[in-house]
Amino acid sequence: MVLENLTPAVKVTAPANFRPGIEFDGTEGTATTEGMTAQPNFDDFLLERGYSPAEYEIIGNPRTSQWQRYDGEWLTSYRFHFRKKSSVIDLPTLFAEAKKTKPTKPKKVLDENKAFVICPADFQIGKTGSRGGTKETIERVLNSYARIEEHLKKNPYGQILILDIGDVIESFSSTATYNQLEGNDLSPMQQTDAAASLLWSLLKMASKYAPVKMGSVASNHCQNRFNGQQVGKPGLDDWGIVILQQLKRLATEVGLDVTFYVPNPYEEAFTIDVFNDGFHHLAAAHGHQAKRPENVPTWWRQMTFGNQPSISAASILVTGHFHHTRILEAGASHNGGSRWWIQASTSDAGSDWFARIAGEDSMPAITCFELQKGVYFQGAILRF
């Protein structure tokens, strides 16, 4: 019997457009190896071409192409993606974090006559300084969150207010544009993503303990700027307010009990009637409007005399911008008690330029305080 001839395997050849090499845009790149008989060490492959594993990391899974050489040996080319390492710790993106969020019900024991106010201020994500960079700032903030949560576990409240007092990102277009270009460790888009993830973490944590009210003010580092000039509507075209809009969408999607506040599009601040009884009128403003901390009470008086709706009715005003803690009794309030100005602490990487000029620095923290329904505020704060 004659055996039938076997059909030879189809010869596989290298793709016509196959070009081994590396393409890199300064942030991310794609590497394509030449044909190899065994899988290479991709880190070594990059190192041989000037991309150190200490500075670059491989992302995703490699793709392969195979073909048969003239001598019958099979070769494999590997195509993989890599990127420049960021100093940021591994935070999930905002939407990935949201997908893991389940609606929570506050613990049953609530004191409806008490509110806890959390004032994250001047995170300036992306900034580098004597206290480190973004990685260290995030670690500082998360440590503050942990201490705040320990307080909430021990103290029941009927509501929690989160006031983003501004400058949550460093940006690249404040008055220190050139220094920011040199010193920042994240792009504006990366800054926004990291800051949103941080504020989302705070919102999620707080919602476990009580219904939440959350607001963001307009601020100088978050302003929409062109050639150094503010453009657009200040209470709308602001990165901090854009972040809050995204948090509102996510909170609505996952069912968190949160009410959100932003300024009027043509203003930069807002006021909340904390217990909806006309007693505690809590205002938030970044503070850059006053230029210097000593000018804040005067600016507040001017806004009140001019009947500016953003803060004129406030019994308590919280500001940031000046990177230190300060408490000042500032006249009489509509409720029969005192007006109080609270200057919130910063959590940033350090304002070394100011320390060089003034010889002063302040310790980072998140400023918090407690309000009681129908009870005058007496100026007591907590720093976490």
Q: Which residues make up each language-model segment?
A:
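Conserved beta-sheet core of the metallophosphoesterase superfamily
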Residues: 29, 233-241, 248-257, 262-266, ...
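Beta-strand-turn-beta hairpins that frame and shape the catalytic cleft
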Residues: 108-118, 271-283, 336-339
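Active-site metal-binding loops of divalent metal-dependent hydrolases
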Residues: 121-123, 166-169, 218-224, 286-289, ...
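Short, solvent-exposed loop/turn segments at secondary-structure boundaries
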Residues: 130-132, 228-229, 354-356
